[in-house]
Swiss-Prot record:
This is 3-phosphoshikimate 1-carboxyvinyltransferase. 3-phosphoshikimate binds at residues 23-24, 28, 170-172, 198, 314, 337, 341. GO terms for molecular function: 3-phosphoshikimate 1-carboxyvinyltransferase activity. Gene3D superfamilies: Enolpyruvate transferase domain (3.65.10.10). Catalyzes the transfer of the enolpyruvyl moiety of phosphoenolpyruvate (PEP) to the 5-hydroxyl of shikimate-3-phosphate (S3P) to produce enolpyruvyl shikimate-3-phosphate and inorganic phosphate. The gene is aroA.
Length: 428
């Protein structure tokens, strides 16, 4: 029997949340620190399953690091070049896309023999476009089970050169190539085919590479030029900003049942595109205030919206449950890549929204939500997807309780989410 957590109806949310570190930034920073020359102190690192998978992999590859007791500060001794394994090695990466994709690329630089594998869901998450691009650059990669999916066997050989990669499935493929290319022997030119999804995540990658001493030129995110034979250099210390996707639940809760909630660790200067989530809440009618290192949200009369949310794919999920509290329908468009995340999020979201009484239209790349007059108490399936669990906690901001099945799945990015949510909540 799955564990479950029942949230009783909440009358008001109010308070401040210091956000855990960003998953996207933490795993990129850990990998660059490992590749860099010098020692890097990373502060406000996220402590979650996805990060532990990256740390375990780096340790197996001979990287020395020291973690503080609460695992949020990590001092990494960089190797000043590529990661190599002296003997054949198998690395288990759970369901961490932010570890699997970049490591698949970076580990093609040497001539090590390395297998990358993970949980059953990881074996359903496509990686073929990345493998194709790496092979264009000379990498030797074999699929061990299903063509185009992990597990992979890597045997090095990547030298750079002219690469093309499909931009339509995941921006992590491009992120992986960008982080790898400076260490290749040759200069690299990467051409993007199709529209690049989740562009703001590429900005995170470019920002981090710059922090570690490497500039990348690009032509309108369609062609990227990277010089080969470079070395990443430690910035000394690097502060990981708060996780903007994680902020979305607290900001949405305030929009629905504030009070006022302030999230700290992100703000005007944030490198994460998911901070744009606050603009969507504002469009719906919430009151939003921005500081340099905080965003604050207060309740407003929420109206449904119809919007392309390709630029905030993770935080957009939170809009789907916020829509339950708006007047009129909400349509979230251009989110095909929800289908290749931790689960097929479009189908999962449609299924669970219907359980609480919403009328839902699920398209190939959009979802339309018509809120019910009265929400229905339901047991919410979470599909081993941290964001499903967190999104549906918002249902309790009504006069109806909600039961979340397998609440511990939030450990992927936010182990103490439900404690933080409860801390802000005053029960009806």
């Amino acid at each position: 029997m799955l564990e479950s957590l029942t949230l009783q109806p909440i009358a008001l949310v109010n308070g401040t949340v210091n956000l855990p570190g960003s998953k996207s930034v933490s795993n990129r920073a850990l990998l660059l620190a490992a590749l860099a020359e010098g020692t890097t102190q990373l502060n406000n690192v996220l402590d979650s399953d996805d990060i532990r998978h990256m740390l375990n992999a780096l340790q197996a590859l001979g990287v020395n690091f020291r973690l503080s007791a609460d695992r949020t500060c990590c001092e990494v001794d960089g190797l000043g070049g590529k990661l190599v394994a002296e003997q054949p090695l198998s690395l288990f990466l759970g369901n961490a896309g932010t570890a699997m994709r970049p490591l698949a690329a970076v580990l093609c630089l040497g001539n090590s023999d390395i297998v990358l594998t993970g949980e059953p869901r990881m074996k359903e998450r496509p990686i073929g476009h990345l493998v194709d691009a790496l092979r264009q650059g000379g990498a030797q990669i074999d699929y061990l089970e299903q063509e185009n999916y992990p597990p992979l066997r890597l045997r090095g050989g990547f030298r750079g050169g002219e690469l093309t990669v499909d931009g339509r499935v995941s921006s992590q493929f491009l992120t992986a190539l960008l982080m790898t290319a400076p260490l290749a022997e040759q200069d690299t030119t990467i051409r993007i085919m199709g529209d690049l999804v989740s562009k703001p995540y590429i900005d995170i990658t470019l920002h981090l590479m710059k922090a570690f001493g490497i500039d990348v030129g690009h032509e309108n995110y369609q062609i990227f030029h990277i010089k080969g034979g470079q070395t990443y250099r430690s910035p000394g210390t690097y502060l990981v900003e708060g996780d903007a996707s994680s902020a979305s639940y607290f900001l949405a809760a305030a929009a629905i049942k504030g009070g006022t909630v302030r999230v700290t660790g992100i703000g005007k200067k944030s490198v994460q595109g998911d901070t744009k989530f606050a603009d969507v809440l504002e469009k719906m009618g919430a009151k939003v205030t921005w500081g340099d290192d905080y965003i604050e949200c207060s309740r407003g009369e929420l109206q449904g919206i119809d919007m392309d949310m390709n630029h905030i794919p993770d935080a957009a999920m939170t809009i789907a449950t916020t829509a339950l509290f708006a007047t009129g329908p909400t349509t979230i468009r251009n989110i095909y890549n929800w289908r290749v995340k931790e689960t097929d999020r479009l189908t999962a979201m449609a299924t669970e929204l219907r359980k609480v009484g919403a009328e839902v239209e699920e398209g190939e790349d959009y979802i339309r939500v018509v809120p019910p007059v009265q929400l229905t108490a339901a047991d919410i399936g979470t599909y081993d997807d941290h964001r499903m669990a967190m999104c549906f906690s918002l249902v309790a901001l009504s006069d109806t309780p909600v039961t979340i099945l397998d609440p511990k799945c939030t450990a992927k990015t936010f182990p103490d989410y439900f404690e933080q949510f409860a801390r802000l909540s005053q029960l009806a």
